[in-house]
């Protein structure tokens, strides 16, 4: 505690010296650096509002100084860290417009990209990038990936309805996009959460157009369950058969065989029922309840 108190007093004394230097020698080549260091001392004390005020003071007094680039970039970064995205955007835009081609402008553009991804406003970033000076490139493949990443982040934050809209927008904007299968899979999950059977059938169907994709097994589980619940037993039987072929675990295979047995029985397909019951009874981990069910059929 004493060490922290000593450090705090040292920072206060340092700022007093810097203020005295700037006040007494405003035309000194060291004055602009003193103002910058004053701002940095506030940053180190986690006093972002005072730091921003100091950096803005520097920019107003020494707008053409090379140190101004660093101060302008600091302002954007501090707003960004505080979650003041709209103010950060404006600050970073000033950096890019005033110092095109600089390292600060390049870093500002990277932070702007992150901000727009966090806000799920990639179209706005694309328009901004096109309008900014400095030969900034933002090609279609990057817009594709960022649009998907933004939607995925929204889903991860539990904003399901917004994520649903964002994934649908991604699929409409990039019908051949690199993350199309991922988007369809997330829409299946959202459909399951919202008990939207039509949505699950639509997007699981899209996934199964590419049967060897990494989501096909999960898609078949959801699709078969929906078809069974909707009493589309013949369709469910076909889905459970596909699931059995793709099952990567014994539990999934057991689920598929149980589904096949029940569907075959309900559509009165005796041959399929016998085959399904025989396969189910051969399973090593069969529960007594399922064993009795297979024998009954």
Residues covered by each model-derived region:
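Single conserved hydrophobic/aromatic residue that forms the stacking wall/gate
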Residues: 2-13
């Amino acid at each position: 505690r004493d060490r922290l108190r000593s450090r705090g007093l040292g920072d206060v004394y340092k700022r007093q010296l810097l203020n005295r230097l700037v006040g007494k020698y405003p035309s000194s080549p060291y004055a602009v650096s003193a103002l910058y260091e004053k701002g940095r001392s506030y940053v180190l004390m986690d006093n972002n509002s005072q730091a921003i005020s100091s950096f803005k003071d520097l920019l107003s007094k020494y707008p053409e100084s090379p140190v101004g680039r660093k101060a302008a970039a600091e302002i954007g970064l501090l707003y960004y860290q505080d979650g003041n995205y709209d103010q950060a955007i404006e600050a970073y835009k000033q950096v890019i417009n005033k110092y095109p081609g600089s390292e600060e402008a390049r870093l500002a553009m990277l932070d702007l990209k992150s901000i727009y991804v966090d806000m799920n406003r990639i179209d706005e970033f694309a328009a901004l990038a096109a309008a900014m000076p400095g030969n900034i490139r933002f090609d279609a493949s990057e817009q594709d990936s960022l649009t998907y990443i933004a939607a995925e982040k929204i889903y991860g934050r539990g904003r399901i309805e917004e994520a649903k809209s964002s994934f649908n927008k991604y699929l409409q904007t990039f019908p051949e996009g690199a993350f199309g299968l991922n988007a369809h899979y997330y829409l299946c999950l959202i459909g399951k959460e919202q008990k939207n059977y039509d949505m699950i059938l639509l997007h699981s169907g899209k996934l199964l157009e590419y049967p060897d994709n990494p989501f096909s097994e999960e898609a078949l589980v959801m699709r078969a369950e929906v078809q069974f619940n909707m009493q589309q037993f013949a369709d469910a039987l076909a889905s459970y058969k596909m699931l059995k072929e793709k099952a990567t675990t014994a539990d999934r295979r057991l689920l598929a065989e149980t589904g096949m047995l029940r569907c075959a029985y309900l559509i009165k397909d005796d041959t399929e029922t016998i085959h399904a019951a025989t396969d189910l009874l051969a399973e090593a981990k069969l529960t007594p309840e399922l064993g009795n069910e297979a024998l009954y059929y």
